[in-house]
Amino acid sequence: MGILRVYHPDIEEFVTVKNDPRELNNFNLSVAVTDAFIAACREDGPFSLVNPRNGREARKIRALSLLDLIARSAWGSGEPGLVFLDTINRSNPTPHAGAIEATNPCGEQPLLPYESCCLGSINLVKVLRGEAIDWEKLERLVHLAVRFLDTS
């Protein structure tokens, strides 16, 4: 998943890149939305885009115009999604390890910088005995699956 913060100077190009179906067609995109951006949208106010290299304001835009651009692009191409990183970080279970900066491609696993996400699944049909669940088999399978994920 490619995530760009809402205040990045290239945000408008990032938001609209998938309007061309030939661009990044096997890659998910999301915008990291901040509380400050949402507040600027509520007030229909300006919002600063900030150069990540020097921390200086590159320019101001109308927050609602950017939100409209995001919505139109999402309606047309299915992307970008929105990731509310400030909200996620308020619930960060390991803030001492760092701030969450991204998620896995589907967004269900918040990630610290440089973390990866290995997902697993279990075919529950394989633990059926007739129409009942074989709970002992499921327990063994879950333990094995967790072991595989822990060592991946």
Task: Go through the PLM ranges and name each one.
Residues 1-138, 152:
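Active-site cavity-forming subdomains of large catalytic enzyme subunits
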Residues 140-147:
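Active-site helix-to-loop segments that bind/position phosphate- or nucleotide-bearing substrates
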